[in-house]
Amino acid sequence: MVGRGRFLAVFYHESSPLANKTQQLGYTLWDAADFRVISRGSVSCLSKGSSLSWVGFNNDLSLMVMDTDGMLSMLVTTGQDSNYETLLWEWAPVLDTVGLRKSTDDCHWPVTVHDGKLVCIPLKGGNTYPDATRRPVTTTLGLRMPLAKSVLSRK
């Protein structure tokens, strides 16, 4: 569960994980001021075999999620239904942190998303949490939609 301003998002298990351990999660996004559901559905953006590691709202109140593979996604509206009554929503990837790691053991601990940048704590050496005895150093990573590499770019 995460909230900011007038919005509240609740995440829950829709069913047991798949055989490859991918979580089957759902979400409901509420406007708490009006007591109405804005959006609900599956968290379809999780990478195969990964799990949800962080949820939050950016400073523009867009809902963001990150999985254990380091993929940051944002809930975006894609239009309206055929009756023009309900907005349609989808998860869009906005940053893949895998390519930004210096080692396969490195990862990024998200703090917030602000002005198009992920504010995070870089973790090294297989650590999955920041050291609680030291003040962490944060870094910012600009959001950029991940693109698939073509066959030609691999040569």
Q: Where would I find each of the regions flagged by the language model?
A:
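Short coil/turn segments that connect the beta-strands within blades of beta-propeller domains
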Residues: G5-F7, D60-L61
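Intrinsically disordered, low-complexity regions in large eukaryotic scaffold subunits
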Residues: E14-S16, K21-K155
